[in-house]
């Protein structure tokens, strides 16, 4: 009959009919047996620091090096030892560090690109207008200018202002670098250091003080990053950062409200949702 002929043809073409039917068996497992709330194991989520996923860095790379993406490479790759692509150990070896440094210097050089012709300072058409003033010899490099340069790069790389201690440390570094290497090199390599800060390479989930069961709630800033990276490949946007600053992520109700806002935003791309299932079920 027709069914027997189909089975024979599939077998002949090495597309075993019986084996393919077995693929559907998993769909017959009751949902409650797979995801039954009362059978949840105790939470085992110790504090951790892990490297950004290749996708997160790729998004940042394309934004930071827009127009010259070919000059800036992605130093991160998948670790086949781990089921989830962003669960690898936070290892950054020498080749990775070298690529990160090259990327940082390349981007900063583009931000401040210029030439000197007959003693005249000429900004490049690739330069960023807001950054070019920091290497223009016609404008005094005051402490206020240095603070502005550091703050702008922090916003560009980390989407936040530098903390007081960070600002003080980077201004001191810029003063030393300018004195030792000259204005252009000193400014550039100081700003490049922002790209190598731990927050630009790693994601932290350390939490606050643990409770009686050893569980520690993430800090608001950590929750903002966790939510962003759970749905997208981008660093937290203004909605998440504002929510963290204003205390909206301090309790479950506030977090739920922010999550609902993210899901309700039709313009927000959420590639991590599909990728989660692809990684969890090893379906690609």
What is the meaning of each model-derived region?
Residues 1-284:
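Low-complexity, glycine/serine/threonine/alanine-rich intrinsically disordered linker
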């Amino acid at each position: 009959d027709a069914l027997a002929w189909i089975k024979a043809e599939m077998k002949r073409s090495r597309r075993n009919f019986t084996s393919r039917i077995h693929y559907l068996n998993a769909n017959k497992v009751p949902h409650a047996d797979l995801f039954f709330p009362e059978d949840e194991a105790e939470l085992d989520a110790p504090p951790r620091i892990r490297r950004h996923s290749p996708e997160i860095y790729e998004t940042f790379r394309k934004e930071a090096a827009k127009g010259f993406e070919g000059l800036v490479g992605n130093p991160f790759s998948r670790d086949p030892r781990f089921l989830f692509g962003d669960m690898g150990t936070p290892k950054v070896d020498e080749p990775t560090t070298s690529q990160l440094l090259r990327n940082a210097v390349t981007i900063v050089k583009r931000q401040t690109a210029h030439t000197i012709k007959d003693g005249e300072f000429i900004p490049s058409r690739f330069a960023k207008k807001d950054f070019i003033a920091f290497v223009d010899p016609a404008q005094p490099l005051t402490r206020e200018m240095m603070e502005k340069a550091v703050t702008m790069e922090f916003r560009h790389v980390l989407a936040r202002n530098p903390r007081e201690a960070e600002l003080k440390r980077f201004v001191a570094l810029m003063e030393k670098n300018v004195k030792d290497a000259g204005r252009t090199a000193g400014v550039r390599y100081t700003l490049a250091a922002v790209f190598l800060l731990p927050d630009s390479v790693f994601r932290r989930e350390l939490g606050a003080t643990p409770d009686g069961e050893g569980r520690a709630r993430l800090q608001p800033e950590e929750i903002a990053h966790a939510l962003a990276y759970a749905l997208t490949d981008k660093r937290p946007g203004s909605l998440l950062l504002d929510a963290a600053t204003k205390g909206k992520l301090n309790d479950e109700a506030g977090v739920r409200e922010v999550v609902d806002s993210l899901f309700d935003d039709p313009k927000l791309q959420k590639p991590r949702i599909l990728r989660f299932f692809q990684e969890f079920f090893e379906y690609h």
